[in-house]
Amino acid sequence: MRIVDLVCRPDARHRLVLALAAGVVVFFLSLAYLQFARAAIASWDAFAVVILVLDWLTILTTPQRTIRARAQQQDLSRLLIFIFVVVTACAALFAVGFLVSVKKSQTGGHFIIHLLLTLLTVIFSWSLVHTVYGLRYAHAFYGDSDEASVHQHAGGLIFPGNRPPDYFDFAYFSFVVGMTCQV
């Protein structure tokens, strides 16, 4: 069994626990070096990075023939997705507010850390929302159907060609919708 298979095997809830653990560890470790607000932002960034890495490993390594079953495993509930969206929006707003509040007297390394944390938080939050929605779209597309009905799906999206969609198709759709809705 490949290492990627082991990493991609946990369902969405186990991934969430791993990401929460990473966020808590980073928060307490960074408190020794950073102010509370910066430690909170670094903690959120660690959480988001773990979720993004694990989700994108799934997106990039899941063969199309197993996506139907994997989509059932990787789906988060609608309530949890709503909570994700609200928390990521708050994290991004907090990061922007944090950037705006920087004192002009702050220079050098402190300003660079401040700026990097802020920019990374916005990028990670934005990417996290669309990645989670891409996984949700795959679940909604295939519905709760079983392997016996390989060519049947709940639908809702139409993909060009005869090839059944894979995770990357749903991620592409999610990011395109996300970018066009933000304009």
Go through each PLM region and give its residues.
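Transmembrane alpha-helix/helix-exit interface in multi-pass inner-membrane proteins
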Residues: I123-A148
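Juxtamembrane helix-capping/reentrant segments at transmembrane boundaries
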Residues: I67-V87
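Loop-to-helix transition at the N-terminal end of transmembrane alpha-helices
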Residues: F36-V53
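Alpha-helical transmembrane segments and their membrane-interface junctions
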Residues: A89-G109, S174-V183
